[in-house]
A protein has these predicted regions:
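Residues that form or immediately flank small-molecule/cofactor binding pockets and catalytic motifs
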Residues: 49, 131, 167-170, 203-205, ...
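Short, flexible, glycine-rich and Lys/Arg-enriched loop motifs at helix boundaries
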Residues: 35, 166-184, 194-216
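Short-chain dehydrogenase/reductase
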Residues: 87, 135-143, 178-186, 215-216, ...
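C-terminal substrate-binding subdomain of Rossmann-fold SDR/epimerase-dehydratase oxidoreductases
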Residues: 192-320
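Short secondary-structure boundary/capping segments
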Residues: 35-36, 123, 189-190, 234-235
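N-terminal Rossmann-like NAD(P)+-binding domain of SDR-like oxidoreductases, especially those catalyzing
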Residues: 1-164, 168
């Protein structure tokens, strides 16, 4: 069962499951996902993870043996204005899901966590052991989610792992696009479509070109590691409690802007705006443990990420 399987990331996970010969059923409220993202062969149960009866019925009807939990409220900045909603969806929702799993004897979960659990780390390379210091209700809710899995494992023997990912971009198939109004790629593409100039917030950071450096990963690479984690849990093989899915090498915002201009053929000079408060110069993670256990690797270049995202965005904006 894939919660949030009609969303941008969840839909890629579902396709990776199908490509590996596994079956899936999706539970998604469709509050930010799209029914059109769901393959025809995959059952879609439209409903909330806060509905325990619906979850138990879905587990019974479809013979669910494990869960990949992608559903949740994912906007770190907005979570500051909506803390109760964030905790309800991400903490209460995860607890309700775990209760339904326990009631039906389902003992395997792959949890989509986030780099937001680290906050603003004071290190050039984030590892799984980097101190956790979330700085938003979203980051806090994801860390609590990891704790819920840990405590449930002690109490019931739940087999689990959490995948912490950073900036997810690109598209595995043109039909699946990132519609978030808060993520960098959609913001750039939206600005270009409206004839506006994309903005860079600060060009005076202590980085090679003065702009923020972040860890960008392709959504298809991320999806493959979710499937690898699920397969290891199915096989009873050991997994770490959490893995960072990082490249080990960051990309600057200026590099992304230049690649976007090259791919789209739209020449532009980004507008330089003041720094945003609390925006760190660099956040990059190692993916060594995930490479060892979860078939994790960066199979896609920055150009691949931009090209696939641009293609999917253009397709989504065309009239049907």
């Amino acid at each position: 069962m894939v919660t949030g399987g009609a969303g941008y990331i969840g839909a890629h996970v579902v396709r990776a499951l199908l490509d590996s010969g596994l079956k899936a059923v999706i539970v998604d409220s469709l509050s930010s996902g799209f029914a059109d993202f769901v393959p025809e062969s995959v059952p879609l149960v439209a409903g909330s993870i806060l509905d325990g009866d619906l979850l138990r019925d879905t587990i019974d009807e479809h013979g669910v043996t494990g869960v990949i939990h992608v559903a949740g409220y994912k906007y770190a900045g907005v979570s500051v204005q909506r803390p109760l909603h964030t905790y309800e969806q991400n903490v209460t929702g995860t607890a309700v899901l775990l209760r339904a799993m326990q009631d039906r004897g389902v003992d395997r979960m792959v949890f989509s966590s986030s780099a937001a659990v680290f906050g603003t780390p004071d290190t050039d390379l984030v590892t799984e052991n980097t101190p956790k210091n979330p700085q938003s209700p979203y980051g806090e809710s994801k860390l609590i989610g990891e704790w819920l899995l840990r405590d449930q494992a002690v109490a019931t023997g739940l087999r689990h792992t959490s995948l912490r990912y950073f900036n997810v971009v690109g598209s595995g198939v043109p039909e699946l696009f990132d519609a978030s109004p808060h993520n960098l790629f959609p913001l750039i593409f939206s600005a270009l479509a409206d004839g506006k100039t994309p903005r860079i917030f600060g060009d005076d950071y202590p980085t090679p070109d003065g702009t923020n450096v972040r860890d960008y990963i392709h959504v298809s690479d991320l999806a493959i590691s979710h499937v690898a984690a699920a397969r290891r849990l199915d096989a009873g093989l050991p997994l770490e409690p959490a893995y960072n899915l990082g490249s080990g090498d960051g990309v600057s915002v200026a590099e992304i802007m230049a690649t976007v201009a090259e791919v789209t053929g739209i020449a532009f000079e980004p507008e330089i705006a003041p720094r945003r408060a609390g925006d760190p110069a660099r956040i990059v993670a190692t993916g060594e443990l995930a490479a060892r256990d979860l078939d994790w690797s960066m199979r896609h270049s920055l150009r691949d990420m931009v090209e696939s995202a641009w293609k999917a965005t253009r397709r989504s904006s065309q009239p049907s």
